[in-house]
Swiss-Prot record:
InterPro entries: Asp/Orn_carbamoyltranf_P-bd, Asp/Orn_carbamoylTrfase, Asp/Orn_carbamoylTrfase_sf, Asp_carbamoyltransf_Asp/Orn-bd, Orn/put_carbamltrans, OTCase_ArgI. Carbamoyl phosphate binds at S56, T57, R58, T59, Q83, R107, H134, P135, T136, Q137, C274, L275, R320. This is Ornithine carbamoyltransferase. The gene is argI. The keyword Heme does not apply. Keywords: Amino-acid biosynthesis, Arginine biosynthesis, Cytoplasm, Transferase.
Length: 334
């Protein structure tokens, strides 16, 4: 795929709608080939660095398994296993790693870090997550949506994101809607809306591609007719405890539960989540939330919805690997 060869993958708006379509088609092919035992290795002899300043289960496993499937070797650099940004600048780290590796994945903090890595390394750099964007997650989401509504184009689908829409997921969803023409509805309190400039830019692009972007606080009108309802965690262990009560009070009404699913009026509506999800009391944080804030049976999503037939979160999680593989194959093989 010469269009992508040696290019970085930093955010979705760096690509055109047709390029995004090509990546999704490649991911679907690679997935089918793996399932059928017909996968052709395109990355034999390639060395890949995986920089993780923030831990992850799905992102790390997806990159590692995808690389191994394709014949590449990986080196994991965790937050305590490198000098990046501490004893060595991002620019210097990029220039060192670029001499040793064929590609670099970065998962961590500011978008400027992954952009600096891409600028100075001289090799493809892939954004596994930054504070601002999560593009590989959206590739998996879009592939999953295609699989569950195979007869529909993206500009015939309605995707609702309920909860805190001002984060990297909200930003990347806006970019995805801009390119695909999705009917995207961000159903959230105004305090949790994304930056107006990005909303305006993406809304104009979405309209040209047959879609629309809506921001609303009204749950009933926001979810009506939805094909998919998506949410993400409200708090994480890395955030100060004083933020928890404030965030929960702000978002409690936007929990994805059976009532919200019913308000869509669509008995076939599906539930999406980028994971991990606090849908029960079986994790340390889930237990703490239940005890301190009365959130038994789920925080951002109820256990009832998460464990229902409507939930396709694990299809989505699997597709992280197939879509990440597509990104690596597209950018590292001619």
């Amino acid at each position: 795929m010469s269009t992508f060869y040696q290019k970085p993958f930093l955010k979705l708006l760096d690509f055109t709608a047709s390029e995004l379509t090509a990546l999704l088609q490649l991911a679907a092919k690679l997935k089918a080939d793996k399932k059928n035992g017909k996968e052709e290795q395109k990355l034999v002899g390639k060395n890949i660095a995986l920089i993780f300043e923030k831990d992850s289960t799905r992102t790390r496993c997806s990159f590692e398994v995808a690389a191994y499937d394709q014949g590449a070797r990986v080196t994991y650099l965790g937050s305590s296993g490198s000098q990046i940004g501490h004893k060595e600048s991002i620019k210097d780290t990029a220039r060192v790693l670029g001499r040793m590796f064929d590609g670099i994945q970065y998962r961590g903090y500011g978008q400027e870090i992954v952009e600096t890595l891409a600028e100075y390394s001289g090799v493809p750099v892939w954004n596994g997550l930054t504070d601002e964007y999560h593009p590989t997650q959206l590739l998996a989401d879009l592939l999953t949506m295609q699989e569950h509504l195979p007869g529909k184009a993206f500009n015939e689908m309605t995707l609702v994101y309920a909860g805190d829409a001002r984060n990297n997921m909200g930003n990347s969803m806006l970019e995805a809607a801009a390119l695909t023409g999705l009917d995207l509805r961000l159903v959230a309190p105004k305090a949790c809306w994304p930056q107006a400039a990005l909303v305006a830019e993406c809304s104009a692009m979405a309209k040209k591609n047959g879609g629309a972007i809506t921001l609303t606080e009204d749950i009933a009108s926001g979810v009506k007719g939805a094909d998919f309802i998506y949410t993400d965690v409200w708090v994480s262990m890395g955030e100060p405890k004083e933020k928890w009560a404030e965030r929960i009070a702000l978002l409690r009404d936007y929990q994805v539960n059976s009532q919200m699913m019913a308000l869509t009026g669509n008995p076939q509506v599906k539930f999406l989540h980028c994971l991990p999800a606090f849908h029960d009391d079986e994790t340390t944080l889930g237990k703490k939330m239940a005890e301190e804030y009365g959130l038994h049976g789920g925080m951002e999503v109820t256990d009832e919805v998460f464990e229902s037939a409507a939930s396709i979160a694990f299809d989505e999680a699997e597709n992280r690997m197939h879509t990440i593989k597509a990104v690596m194959v597209a950018t590292l093989s001619k």
